[in-house]
Amino acid sequence: MRSRFSAFALGDAGYLLRSWHPTTRPAELTLDPDVRWYRLDIERTERGGPFDTDGVVEFVAHYKGAERGSLHEVSRFVRDGRDWFYVDAVTADRRA
């Protein structure tokens, strides 16, 4: 999860696509260059440990762009071997 936030902050769409599960991954991903992601708050996690094959992360990611705001998301991940992949999420946008 933290590596995906870092990829958003750095504008690394390639990493985001590579870490997205193939069953839900979009064909392409365009990031807004005017949005700056600057803080990640992990609210809770479920599973996702060294012996788990899936996990859930609830977080709030804060950004600045034309306006300041935050993205509140509950994301699902699955493990394939040593690697974790983002599957999907439920979001609730909030203004800061």
Region locations from a protein language model:
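Tryptophan-centered motif/residue detector
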Residues: W20, W37-R39, W84
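Aromatic side chains
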Residues: F5-F8, Y15, F59, F77, ...
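Core segments of small alpha/beta cavity-forming domains
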Residues: M1-P33
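Surface-exposed, charged secondary-structure patches
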Residues: D32-S70
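Short, charge- and proline-biased low-complexity linear segments
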Residues: T30-D41, D88-A96
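A short, structured loop/turn motif at beta-sheet edges
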Residues: L10, R47-T53, R79-D83
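Short beta-strand edge/turn micro-motifs at domain boundaries
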Residues: H72-A96
